[in-house]
Structures are given as structure tokens and as C-alpha cells.
């Protein structure tokens, strides 16, 4: 009789014991020295996973009793990384992070271990984001990782307006010439305008003038001077005086300026590259007159006082929410004829004019508030049914492709006003909830830390209004809350609220702001409002109509301006500020 017995996980058992022997320095026959640190191992194990070690053994005709010594340059691989590599060779497990991925790639290159290189490549692809795409592009070029290179380049191109800004240029000035030239040549480069592209070129050259001045002539040809403002052209002309062989460029600039003096003033918009960004307010969904739900997506181009239809949503809904993050607009939730709280979520690509279905929200929501903080999308509060509010704050995890519970507000609310500060904190200001059986807006400010998932500060204040307030930061610690009846300055450091005389005037139609309006801060103390319901002058009839107009509030002057009317009058649409590429004008 014969019986075969097989040990479970025997290979793992053997390697685990070999690794223990390695750490106890038992039966070793190979030593790796890095900056006075010596690591002992077994030739057979390393030869099985590393062609480098295998070739060293075979090329030197080593005997079984011989010992192999390898010295590694500490400037190439640190002792910590070598120790981590040996653990990987023995266990097949490795923890990769943004901090160690570069050295692990060097280790994979040094020991010629393609599987580790694949793991590093996968990590870079899954963890790429705006803040690290420049560094990842450097790594991709250095280690010839094409897929990572393409993704990182797209990330820089799509966020060039950030990298060329004062906030991002500190790191971007180190961009190699081959990458910088490729970016400037790209017609789809996301710049604020051609002025920013020209300024970026000048700053990049001046950062290392002796090394980069030779590239200026070639890269200058990638700038469309007809799309640059007179002010920036004159600034560039002055900068060129300090550069060698720049007379031809100065002549081109002067020619454009002279031609403009002889012609009628025209908009520079038609000359911008396809990727130049337009500050816009995007309106999505909503409910039309007579109760019909809408699926249209409209954009108001602020600079041109112009409305465009961008697309149609994959579903019809009102009381949904939206936020923009780079080239994408995220939408979720809402109500329809059949369902009062939808779980559905979608992402709209403004560049490609395409929609991608996202995983559903954990619960169906209406009147929730979507916001982007640190490049991550959040959903704050909301209602799951009439008079049933939630305190949940959800975060969309791009890597795991799922909605996660990030934390909770201090009380359940919907219709909240949210403002961000930095890449970490959400300030959730007032919201609707049940107070003694009645729907009421409460005066509360929650500072939600997205890193810890906790409300780290909660401030209450007396409230005399029932609409979503307008928010802004004055100085670092002063949060301003504006409404029709009262305005409050909240000192976050001293935890103190003071009333101010500033207030928000009624809309031009003499109606107050309402949760049904699309409200969006567009910067420079200006606020966009459209849609929503308005009451008739005869209060006794209690008739409501949908506001057909759009308005812009100048908070400094305290005045409303009537804008071009929206294509449709909509109640409870979603609204967000977005940067649309100029090619949308050509597409439409």
C-alpha cells in the first residue's frame, strides 16, 4: 500500500524558517554590505529570485563552500531598503508607499526582479493624484514605466493651471526641458489662459537661466501671442531685454501690439488653445414647471455671460448634488417621480463629454451637499425621506472605487452650506433639522477634519434666518456667514460669534434665497444664483413659480446683477463651479 501526504503551505513554511535563519545569521553564505551595515542571506534563495546573484555565482565559478560578498553603494540603496528587499525575497510580501517606491524600483533594477517592478508600477498607477503626478512622471521616465508616464503626464497637463500658479510652481520649476516643452506644445494643455503659459515659460527659464536660456527660442514658438493680453505681452517684452538673441521675439511681440492698436478691440477667447480653461457655473438636473424632471446639463460661461448646453445626465432628478474635481463633475442622489432618495452616482468627463457610472451611495439622499477637499469628493448630510435627516459624511475612494463613511456631523442636517480651508478641513455651516417637531435651520458650525474623520470643533450661534447662508473666510480664523436678516463673523480661534451690519440684499425679484436655488460662490466676493421657486406678490394666494433668471451678487457693493437667462427655469437643480476647456465652445 502507498499513501501520499502533502503538507499544507509547505513552501511558505520552509521560506519562513529560512528567513528566521537569515535573521539569526545561521548557515549564511552570502553577505551584502551597505554603509557599514552587513546583511546575511543564503545564496540559493537569492539566486532563485535574482538573476544578478545567479550570474555572479555562475560567472565566478563559485564552489559550494565559497562565500559571496556584495557591496552596495548607499547612495543608490539604503540599508533600510536592502533589509526590506531581503524580506521580500524570502516572503514574497512587500509594503510599498510613496516614501519608499523609488528605492524599491532601484532595488528591482539592481537585483533584476521584474515582479517587484510590476508591484511598484501597479502602486504608482493606483496612487497617482494631482499632488504627486509631477514626481511620478520623473520616476516613470527614469525607470521606463510607460503606463505611469502617460497617466502622470495627463495629470500634469490637466492640472497645469495649478502647477504654473504660485502654489504649485515651487516644485514645477524643476520640470525637465523635454517634459516642459511637450506640455507647452500640447493644444489640450489646461491653462487659465495663454498669459499663464507665457508667464510659466518665462519663470521656468529664469529659474535656471544659464541652463535653460537655450530652450527659450524653441519653446517660445509654442505660445500663441494673439491669445496673450497686452499687459502680459509688455511684461514679456521687458523680460526679454535680459536674454541673449531675443530681438526676434521682441519684434513679434511688438508686431502684435501694433496690430491691436490699429484694429477694433476683440475678445482673446477665440485665440486660446483648446485646453484653456473657462470659469463656469454648471447646472444639472432640477424640476421644470408642471413637475417634469430634467436631465439637462448647462454651463454659464462667466467671462462671456453665455449659456451652453453641455450634455444630458444619465437620469432625471431634482434636489441632487454635484461638485467638480479637475476635469470631472461628480453627481449623486436626488428625487424623481418614483423615488424620493436616489443612491445613484455618476462622473462626467468635461474633456471627453462622457459619463461613467460610479458605485451607488450607501443610502439614498436628497438635499445633501457634495464638496471637493484635497482632490477628494465628499457627500455631507442630507435627507433619506421627508423629515428624516442624516449626519453621515461619505468619501469617494478612487482607488477602491467605493463610498466610505468618513465620519459624522454633530447633528443630522440637510441643506448645509460647506466651505473648505486647505486640503484637510470642511466647515459645515448651518442646516435644516427637526427642532421641537418643526423643520428649522440651526446655527452650528462643524469643523470636520478629513484626516481623522472627526468634528474637531463645534460652534453654535444664535440664528435669525432660514435659508442657506453665503460663506467666506476673512483672514485665517474669521469665518463670515451672510444672510438677509443678519450676518455673523465667527472667530474660530477664540470660539466667538459677533454680529455684523453687512447683510445679503433680496434678489432682484424681491424674493429671499431658498434651499431650492442653485447657489455658487465664483470667487472675488461674487455669488451666482439661478433657478429656485419664487412667491407671487399676493401672499394670500400662496402661488409659487420657478425663477427664470440668473443673478450675480457683488458682496463688496451689496448689489445684484441680472445675467443672461438660463435655457430653462429649474427648481432644485444641482450647481457647482467648474473649469471648462475652450474646446467645448468649438464642440457646441
Curated annotation (Swiss-Prot):
GO terms for cellular component: Cul3-RING ubiquitin ligase complex; cytoplasm; cytoskeletal calyx; cytoskeleton. GO terms for molecular function: ubiquitin-like ligase-substrate adaptor activity. Keywords: Cytoplasm, Cytoskeleton, Developmental protein, Differentiation, Kelch repeat, Phosphoprotein, Repeat, Spermatogenesis. Gene3D superfamilies: 1.25.40.420, Kelch-type beta propeller, Potassium Channel Kv1.1, Chain A. Kelch repeats lie at residues 280-327, 328-375, 377-423, 425-475, 476-525, 526-580. It holds the Pfam family Kelch_1. GO terms for biological process: cell differentiation; proteasome-mediated ubiquitin-dependent protein catabolic process; spermatogenesis. Interacts with CYLC1; the interaction may be relevant for proper acrosome attachment to the nuclear envelope. PANTHER family: KELCH-LIKE PROTEIN 32, LD33804P. This is Calicin. The gene is CCIN.
Amino acid at each position: 500500500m502507498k499513501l501520499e501526504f502533502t503538507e499544507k503551505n509547505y513552501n511558505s513554511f520552509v521560506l519562513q524558517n529560512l528567513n528566521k535563519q537569515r535573521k539569526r545569521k545561521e548557515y549564511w553564505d552570502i553577505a551584502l554590505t551597505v554603509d557599514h551595515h552587513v546583511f546575511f542571506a543564503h545564496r540559493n534563495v537569492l539566486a532563485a529570485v535574482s538573476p544578478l546573484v545567479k550570474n555572479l555565482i555562475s560567472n565566478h565559478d563559485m564552489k559550494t563552500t565559497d562565500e559571496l560578498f556584495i557591496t552596495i553603494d548607499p547612495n543608490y540603496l539604503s540599508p533600510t531598503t536592502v533589509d526590506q528587499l531581503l524580506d521580500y525575497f524570502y516572503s514574497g510580501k512587500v509594503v510599498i508607499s510613496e516614501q519608499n517606491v523609488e528605492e524599491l524600483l532601484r532595488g528591482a533594477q539592481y537585483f533584476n526582479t521584474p515582479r517587484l517592478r510590476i508591484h511598484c508600477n501597479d502602486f504608482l498607477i493606483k496612487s497617482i493624484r494631482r499632488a504627486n503626478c509631477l514626481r511620478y512622471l520623473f520616476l516613470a521616465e527614469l525607470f521606463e514605466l510607460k503606463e505611469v508616464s502617460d497617466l502622470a503626464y495627463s495629470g500634469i497637463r490637466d492640472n497645469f493651471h495649478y502647477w504654473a500658479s504660485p502654489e504649485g510652481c515651487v516644485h514645477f520649476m524643476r520640470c525637465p526641458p523635454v517634459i516642459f516643452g511637450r506640455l507647452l506644445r500640447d493644444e489640450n494643455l489646461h491653462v487659465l489662459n495663454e498669459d499663464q503659459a507665457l508667464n510659466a515659460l518665462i519663470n521656468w527659464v529664469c529659474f535656471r537661466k544659464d541652463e535653460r536660456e537655450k530652450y527659450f527660442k524653441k519653446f517660445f514658438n509654442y505660445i500663441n501671442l494673439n491669445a496673450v493680453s497686452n499687459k502680459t505681452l509688455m511684461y514679456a517684452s521687458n523680460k526679454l531685454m535680459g536674454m541673449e538673441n531675443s530681438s526676434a521675439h521682441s519684434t513679434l511681440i511688438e508686431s502684435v501690439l501694433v496690430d491691436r492698436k490699429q484694429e477694433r478691440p476683440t475678445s482673446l477667447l477665440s485665440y486660446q488653445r483648446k485646453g484653456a480653461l473657462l470659469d463656469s457655473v454648471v447646472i444639472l438636473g432640477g424640476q421644470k414647471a408642471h413637475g417634469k424632471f430634467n436631465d439637462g446639463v448647462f454651463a454659464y460661461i462667466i467671462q462671456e455671460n453665455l449659456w451652453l448646453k453641455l450634455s444630458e445626465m444619465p437620469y432625471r432628478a431634482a434636489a441632487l448634488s454635484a461638485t467638480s474635481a479637475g476635469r470631472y463633475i461628480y453627481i449623486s442622489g436626488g428625487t424623481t417621480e418614483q423615488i424620493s432618495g436616489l443612491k445613484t452616482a455618476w462622473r462626467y468627463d468635461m474633456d471627453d463629454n462622457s459619463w461613467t457610472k460610479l458605485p451607488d451611495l450607501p443610502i439614498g439622499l436628497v438635499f445633501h451637499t457634495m464638496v471637493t477637499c484635497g482632490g477628494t469628493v465628499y457627500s455631507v448630510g442630507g435627507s433619506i425621506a421627508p423629515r428624516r435627516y442624516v449626519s453621515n459624511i461619505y468619501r469617494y475612494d478612487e482607488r477602491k472605487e467605493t463610498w466610505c463613511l468618513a465620519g459624522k456631523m454633530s447633528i443630522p442636517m440637510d441643506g448645509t452650506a460647506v466651505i473648505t480651508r486647505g486640503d484637510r478641513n470642511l466647515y459645515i455651516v448651518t442646516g435644516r433639522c427637526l427642532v421641537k417637531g418643526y423643520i428649522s435651520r440651526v446655527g452650528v458650525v462643524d469643523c470636520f477634519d478629513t484626516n481623522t474623520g472627526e468634528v474637531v470643533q463645534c460652534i453654535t450661534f444664535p440664528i435669525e434666518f432660514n435659508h442657506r447662508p453665503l460663506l467666506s473666510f476673512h483672514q485665517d480664523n474669521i469665518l463670515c456667514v451672510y444672510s438677509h436678516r443678519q450676518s455673523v463673523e465667527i472667530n474660530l480661534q477664540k470660539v466667538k460669534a459677533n454680529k455684523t451690519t453687512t447683510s445679503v440684499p433680496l434678489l432682484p425679484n424681491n424674493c429671499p434665497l431658498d434651499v431650492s436655488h442653485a447657489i455658487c460662490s465664483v470667487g472675488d466676493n461674487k455669488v451666482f444664483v439661478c433657478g429656485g421657486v419664487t412667491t407671487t406678490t399676493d401672499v394670500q394666494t400662496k402661488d409659487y413659480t420657478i425663477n427664470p433668471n440668473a443673478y450675480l451678487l457683488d458682496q463688496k457693493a451689496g448689489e445684484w446683477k441680472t445675467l443672461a437667462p438660463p435655457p430653462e427655469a429649474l427648481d432644485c437643480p444641482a450647481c457647482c463651479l467648474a473649469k471648462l476647456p475652450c474646446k467645448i465652445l468649438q464642440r457646441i
